[in-house]
């Protein structure tokens, strides 16, 4: 694939084909041809390295990254689990333990594992990779790799990006500091220690919520919720590999090896889409993480399955597809999981009882004060990465990079060390995701702008059957043939606006609770229509490595039952 998209001969052929077209398209077929060729031009220009020197540097960079990832596969991290036992742990397990384990010593063991990972990546090639990335960017006329990636991925300069990020930082700074002060006053100075912070913010509530987020029921709730939203997959084939196992890549992701498009004869080529996670069903919090993964990666899959252009270049997930644009689709879907009316309709315990209002309020009381802090947990990454890639080669020492990480965490998060230390974030290691993390924050800004539009237009989001068709028409159909900003203009009627996310972060607990109460009251009175489609219009396989757990050859309902039985047979109920 990389050889194909980086072939300069193909780029020259596309340019020649475009140059041969008449200045004015005489008919629709010519217009469609021009449209498709422009899509291929954007793809090749985003991925082809014109300079011989840069091509050589890229080859060396790929080797450095391959060596690091090969070594990383052999690294075993350990922590103390819920039962007080030392166990091997994935990044997901470390994160969940930090949030939910009532033992401070156990939480600290997870944090220390992450700190050890920071030192490990610095000792196993990350510094050389940063130097090589900068050399590669300079060979193409950029000051550094961060500037290069922002220009390539988001079609804006780093200065333009930081005009947005600086504005958001200023809008949410006081809310973040206020939350930390209040937490320290309530729990003492130790509350902001990195192994305590996440637990005190949400740990006890997460444990109480756990019984309402059955891991085994997660698949069924995803299918039902997406059906009620009117989301369909246009005949796509999807394979979901959701559970952790040794040697598996430790970060959820979605990949489409066969992009969707209409071929030259006008026949529909449905997408083939795989997504993965590393859930541990018997760990507290795993059910909530699982359904978040299903909504998030399922949102990506819905996006790529619904790109209806005349070439596959428009529906593949790499450049020129903007990360922020792609993440808007997935993060919009997983944002619904925080809505009180969604929780009331779907979050149920083993007896089928709905989550009580009091627990929803407790969740808001626990999380709303730290809404700004949560978003700033994303914000800190681009501040760190921009400064990192501005370092000279001589400055790139382990001690200086660690000092930079701690300085950024103090300035943006307000704590000496973040609960997820910066250099333990896997996105920084991979060429595709490095210097791109800001895309998540830009996406969440677009998510809240999108949510505000649907709330103005319809009054609600959960199980609103108008949402799937609207997203398909305005956000998904044209794929990367339209800019992120233009998708927002198409649906909401206004350009990119960070105000909606900042306003949500700055809400008080009482304001957020009143909004939640209003949603629940309206939902109780609403007559929800039945889904118009009988299923998600997809062939779905649930696997665990090479083992087939369940599929929907009979029906989505049968698949969900198979999955539930499989999980129940292999994992005891999590500790409550």
Stretches with model-predicted labels:
Residues 294, 302-303, 318, 332, ...:
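C-terminal, non-catalytic "cap/extension" segments appended to globular domains
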Residues 1-120, 395, 431-435, 536-576:
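N-terminal helix-rich structural modules
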Residues 265-272, 292-293, 297-309, 343-347:
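Alpha-helical recognition segments enriched in aromatics with Gly/Pro capping
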Residues 165-174, 319-358:
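Post-HExxH zinc-binding segment in Zn-dependent metallohydrolases
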Residues 86-93, 127-278, 355-367, 527-575:
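Active-site-proximal, well-structured secondary-structure segments within enzyme catalytic domains
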Residues 1-7, 36-57, 86-122, 132-172, ...:
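Short His/Asp/Glu-rich catalytic/ion-coordination signatures at enzyme active sites or charged loops
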Residues 286-294, 301-332:
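Post-HEXXH active-site segment of zinc metalloproteases
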Residues 211-214, 275-295:
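Short pre-active-site segment immediately N-terminal to the catalytic Zn-binding motif
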């Amino acid at each position: 694939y990389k050889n194909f998209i980086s072939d300069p001969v193909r780029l020259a052929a596309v340019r020649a084909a475009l140059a041969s077209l008449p200045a004015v398209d005489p008919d629709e077929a010519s217009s469609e041809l021009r449209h498709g060729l422009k899509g291929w031009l954007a793809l090749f220009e985003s991925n082809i390295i014109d300079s011989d020197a840069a091509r050589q540097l890229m080859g060396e960079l790929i080797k450095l990254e391959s060596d690091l990832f090969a070594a990383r596969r052999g690294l075993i991290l350990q922590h103390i689990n819920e039962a007080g036992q030392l166990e091997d742990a994935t990044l997901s397990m470390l994160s969940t333990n930090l949030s939910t384990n009532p033992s401070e010593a156990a939480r600290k063991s997870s944090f220390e594992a992450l700190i050890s990972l920071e030192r490990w990546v610095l000792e196993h090639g990350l510094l050389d990779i940063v130097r090589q990335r900068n050399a590669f960017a300079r060979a193409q006329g950029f000051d550094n790799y961060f500037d290069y990636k922002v220009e390539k991925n988001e079609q804006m300069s780093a200065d333009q990006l930081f005009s947005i990020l600086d504005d958001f930082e200023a809008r949410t700074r006081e809310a973040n500091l206020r939350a930390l002060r209040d937490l320290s006053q309530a729990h003492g100075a130790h509350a902001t220690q990195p192994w305590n912070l996440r637990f005190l913010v949400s740990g006890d509530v997460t444990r109480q919520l756990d019984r309402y987020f059955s891991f085994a029921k997660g698949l069924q709730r995803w299918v039902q919720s997406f059906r009620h939203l009117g989301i369909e997959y246009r005949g796509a084939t999807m394979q979901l590999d959701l559970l952790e196992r040794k040697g598996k890549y430790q970060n959820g992701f979605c990949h489409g090896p066969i992009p969707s498009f209409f071929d030259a004869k006008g026949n529909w080529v449905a997408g083939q889409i795989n997504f993965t996670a590393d859930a541990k069903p018997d760990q507290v919090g795993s059910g909530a993480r699982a359904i978040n993964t299903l909504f998030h990666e399922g949102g990506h899959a819905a996006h790529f399955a619904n790109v209806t252009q005349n070439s596959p270049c428009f529906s593949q997930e790499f450049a020129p597809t903007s990360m922020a644009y792609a993440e808007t689709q997935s993060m919009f879907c997983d944002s619904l999981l925080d809505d009180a009316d969604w929780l009331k309709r779907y979050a149920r315990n083993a007896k089928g009882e709905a989550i009580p209002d009091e627990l929803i309020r407790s969740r808001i009381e626990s999380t709303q004060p730290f809404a700004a802090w949560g978003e700033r947990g994303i914000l800190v990454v681009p501040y760190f990465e921009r400064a990192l890639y501005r370092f000279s080669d001589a400055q790139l020492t382990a001690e200086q990079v660690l000092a930079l990480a701690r300085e950024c965490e103090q300035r943006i998060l307000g704590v000496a060390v973040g609960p997820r230390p910066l250099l333990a974030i896997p996105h920084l290691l991979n060429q595709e995701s490095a210097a791109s993390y800001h895309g998540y924050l830009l996406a969440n800004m677009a998510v809240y702008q999108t949510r505000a539009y649907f709330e103005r237009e319809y009054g609600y989001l959960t199980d609103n059957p108008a949402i799937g068709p609207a997203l398909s028409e305005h956000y998904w159909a044209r794929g990367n043939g339209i800019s992120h900003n233009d998708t927002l203009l198409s649906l909401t009627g206004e350009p990119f606006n960070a105000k909606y996310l900042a306003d949500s972060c700055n809400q008080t607990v009482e304001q957020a609770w009143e909004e939640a109460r209003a949603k629940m009251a309206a939902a109780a009175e609403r007559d929800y229509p039945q889904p118009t489609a009988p299923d998600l219009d997809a062939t779905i396989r649930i696997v665990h490595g090479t083992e087939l757990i369940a599929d929907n050859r009979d029906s989505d309902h049968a698949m969900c039952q198979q999955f539930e039985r499989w999980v129940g047979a292999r994992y005891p109920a999590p500790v409550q």
